[in-house]
Design a protein with these regions (language model features):
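N-terminal signal peptide c-region/cleavage motif recognized by signal peptidases
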Residues: 12-17
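Boundary of Sec targeting at the N-terminus
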Residues: 18-21, 164-165
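Substrate-binding/access-modulating region of protease and related hydrolase catalytic domains
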Residues: 22-27, 241-313, 325-328, 354-360, ...
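Inhibitory N-terminal propeptides of secreted protease zymogens
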Residues: 22-150, 155-156, 266-267, 426, ...
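Protease zymogen maturation seam
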Residues: 116-123, 130-194, 407, 423, ...
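Subtilisin-like serine protease catalytic core
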Residues: 171-180, 188-200, 207-251, 313-314, ...
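Catalytic-core environment of secreted peptidases
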Residues: 184, 188-201, 321-363
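Hydrolase catalytic cores
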Residues: 240, 344-419
């Protein structure tokens, strides 16, 4: 039993300090543990494979249900990712390219000029009777040098959990000076008590308000501890869902980034995931080139899932989630896109109507990292994403294998209680000084 516990502890990634305390016993029982490991490892591999299949099947089922319910507005690409039906995004098209598209029956909508990012996007509607896949193929044949892609959909990477709300958080606002931070998500309930004291500016949906569970929960963790906001925090919230159950689209996310760039918001949280997309990729790269720091959830599709975006784009800070015992969530994505970890389970967060609910997922770990990054940036406004990542990593506690790894990245960032203790002892100031001294 002890040997099995040791093997499982190693698999779950105990902190190095705990492993070091067990080292003499491990050496004494090495022959036994090695034998058990040979027996246990295949079982763990099969369990992980079963989990991956279950998560993949669940996501496929969710997508099929959405497609069945909203077939009038949804379609799929060649990899079965959900897209806006009949819509193709042309990135900086030439006049000749647009003329060819019109001649083939496409209708071009008003260009979206994202001047703050230096981008122009023209949505094109496919001719009647032509599928979205056929539309993409047609445009790429008509204009091989042009850039055309689907308008992919992006959804949250976490949700509510069952059970009543406990007392896991203190209800005390985060320490330190107020920070400025951006959010691209679903709608936020600005009247929620958990956001009282925060300064909220909103964008999207033609000014209409669509408070949503996911956006409100993420916002409450971005400006405070989920139950109370740090007074004076400025939250710039872009609603790219607008009440639609299908999620946000690539065009909306790009426009949200452009608005945040226009507002000179340097740190942005993106707790949404989806496939690679040419427009989103260019928008993310343009934002980063202009000094913005993007923090994104890595997703909950399981350890074997392909990297999800935008977290997998270069220089985006990808965040995974652990439980209160520092164990990575089984459903969390793994890979090179994982930069940091934060607690993302058994958290209390705000939901519309003045309510609170427990939440789980990488969606709710990412705002902890984004809030820390915003605080550090307030100390050194000229720091870039690499410098901030280095400062965050300096605060992080290494988990799993020594050094950066595909499960925990560079380690677990401090929780609010840890931050308060660090602030009182000078630890946070030390991290800020590392940002100031970064090249």
């Amino acid at each position: 039993m002890l040997a099995q516990a040791l093997a499982l502890a190693a698999w779950l990634g105990l902190a190095p300090a705990a492993s070091a305390q067990l080292q003499p016993l491990q050496q004494a029982t090495a022959p036994l543990t090695q034998g058990v490991s040979r027996a246990v490892d295949p079982l763990l591999d099969r369990t992980t494979a079963s989990l991956d299949r279950a998560l993949s099947q669940a996501r496929q089922l969710q997508q099929r249900q959405l497609l069945r319910r909203h077939r009038d507005v949804l379609d799929t690409d060649s990899y079965d990712n959900l897209v806006v039906r009949g819509q193709v995004l042309a990135l900086a098209p030439t006049a000749e390219g647009l003329a060819r598209a019109r001649a083939a029956g496409f209708t071009d909508q008003a260009p979206r000029r994202l001047e703050s990012l230096g981008l122009e996007i023209v949505p094109l509607r496919a001719p009647a009777g032509q599928s979205t896949r056929q539309a993409i193929q047609t445009l790429r044949k008509l204009d091989p040098a042009g850039s055309y892609d689907y308008d992919h959909l992006y959804s949250g990477s976490g949700g509510l959990t069952t059970g009543s709300v406990g007392s896991g958080t203190s209800g005390t606002a985060a320490s330190g000076s107020p920070w400025r931070v951006g959010l691209i998500d679903s709608g936020v309930d600005a009247a929620h008590p958990a956001l009282r004291g925060a300064q909220l500016q909103r964008w999207g949906c033609d000014g209409q308000l669509h408070p949503d569970v996911h956006g409100t929960a993420v916002a409450s963790l971005l400006v405070g501890d989920g139950r109370q906001a740090q007074p004076g925090v400025q939250l710039f919230a872009a609603d790219v869902y607008c009440g639609a159950p299908t999620g946000g689209n690539a065009l909306g996310v790009a426009q949200g980034l452009a608005w945040l760039a226009q507002q000179q918001v340097r740190v942005v949280n993106l707790s949404l995931v989806g496939p690679d997309n040419a427009v989103l990729k260019r928008a993310v790269a343009a934002a980063i080139a202009r000094g913005m720091v993007l923090v994104a959830a890595v997703g909950n599709d399981g350890p074997a899932a392909a990297p999800l975006f935008p977290s997998a784009y270069p220089q985006v800070i990808g965040v995974t989630a652990v439980d209160p015992r520092d164990r990575v969530l089984p459903e969390a994505g793994r890979g090179e896109q994982v930069d940091l970890a934060a607690v993302g389970a058994q958290l209390q967060a705000a939901t519309p109507g003045g309510k609170f609910q427990r939440v789980r997922g990488t969606s709710f770990a990412a705002p902890r990292v984004a809030a820390l990054a915003a605080q550090l940036l307030a100390a050194q406004p000229n720091a870039d994403a690499d410098a901030l990542l280095g400062a965050l990593a300096a605060q992080a506690r290494d988990l799993g294998k020594p050094g950066p790894d595909p499960v925990y990245g560079r380690g677990l960032v401090p929780g609010l209680e840890d931050e308060r203790a660090a602030t009182s002892s000078g630890g946070m100031e030390e991290a800020r000084s590392q940002v100031r001294s970064a090249p």
